[in-house]
Swiss-Prot record:
The lineage of its organism: Bacteria, Pseudomonadati, Pseudomonadota, Gammaproteobacteria, Enterobacterales. The keyword Metal-binding does not apply. It catalyses: (Z)-3-ureidoacrylate + H2O + H(+) = (Z)-3-aminoacrylate + NH4(+) + CO2; (Z)-3-ureidoacrylate + H2O = (Z)-3-aminoacrylate + carbamate + H(+); (Z)-2-methylureidoacrylate + H2O + H(+) = (Z)-2-methylaminoacrylate + NH4(+) + CO2. Belongs to the isochorismatase family. RutB subfamily. It comes from Shigella flexneri serotype 5b (strain 8401). This is Ureidoacrylate amidohydrolase RutB.
Amino acid sequence: MMTTLTARPEAITFDPQQSAQIVVDMQNAYATPGGYLDLAGFDVSTTRPVIANIQTAVTAARAAGMLIIWFQNGWDEQYVEAGGPGSPNFHKSNALKTMRKQPQLQGKLLAKGSWDYQLVDELVPQPGDIVLPKPRYSGFFNTPLDSILRSRGIRHLVFTGIATNVCVESTLRDGFFLEHFGVVLEDATHQAGPEFAQKAALFNIETFFGWVSDVETFCDALSPTSFARIA
């Protein structure tokens, strides 16, 4: 059953049962003091409301029959998957750079099985959800995401998570290139860096690659009364 979500730059209509909510990298690394972003000098002091908003959005999406996909960014304990000096990721990943500057952190940041890699305690995948590891910013790179979506007839993706200007935007952009419709819930995301990075990412998304809405509006669009209005 179709519903219409009020968004910028215009409303978008979708069928929740042929849509997915993508939760990007809600790991201790990105959302918890003592995690990678915090240790690398990024401000994570305002992530708690984002976690609560994601909880709300996921609950509404699951109740409406949307597929929930959780991403965890990181690599094996030896960081082979991160790439060596021949990879730009080796030079640009702030996690890898932080560990080179602080060798005592080696093996602790974004390593699979570590506390840093784990999802935050408040966000727990449920049976029927899909949890995917990803080795780079985009959730489409070297993962089965596109085939998972296409095999289920899913074309509309609703994004939440961290960081808006890095992994969220990268995944939404790649989805756009693969003919997926991407919506980001702005109050269920958080940037890495200054506030202008959040504003710039949202501007890019709503102007060039997708749509921007918020959690309250999203939940309202999934309510039974909204389906009744469309019907």
